[in-house]
Amino acid sequence: MARGSLRRLLRLLVLGLWLALLRSVAGEQAPGTAPCSRGSSWSADLDKCMDCASCRARPHSDFCLGCAAAPPAPFRLLWPILGGALSLTFVLGLLSGFLVWRRCRRREKFTTPIEETGGEGCPAVALIQ
């Protein structure tokens, strides 16, 4: 009797392997193994790839488990903080520029010295040589 049950088990094993081979040759996809593009996941219920963006509206769909975790919510205060920092930098730059200009303006002499060479007595060619 043990020999008959062993044969039966062997037949079942061969039959199972044969069915698995036929299934793989036929191209039938196992759930979760379909070659979906990035941002989509295989839905066993619908037998096609579904977009992961729809998981926000329906998070309990069967294909949402294959999607990566949802990206974190964007930081909404980024632009106001960045704008404030740039504005502060611009105002401080203008203020420091004005203070430097005012200080240098105070030291500047309003008349420039005039060099008197005596007219035509000293030609430019003589200075170069």
From Swiss-Prot:
Membrane topology category: Single-pass type I membrane protein
GO BP term, example: cell differentiation
TM annotation in the entry: 81-101
TNFR-Cys-type repeats, residues: 36-67
Gene3D superfamilies hit by this protein: 4.10.400.20
GO CC terms: cell surface; plasma membrane; ruffle
Keywords, in A-Z order: Angiogenesis, Apoptosis, Cell adhesion, Developmental protein, Differentiation, Disulfide bond, Membrane, Receptor, Signal, Transmembrane, Transmembrane helix
Role of this protein: Receptor for TNFSF12/TWEAK. Weak inducer of apoptosis in some cell types. Promotes angiogenesis and the proliferation of endothelial cells. May modulate cellular adhesion to matrix proteins.
Name of the protein: Tumor necrosis factor receptor superfamily member 12A
Organism in which the protein naturally occurs: Homo sapiens (Human)
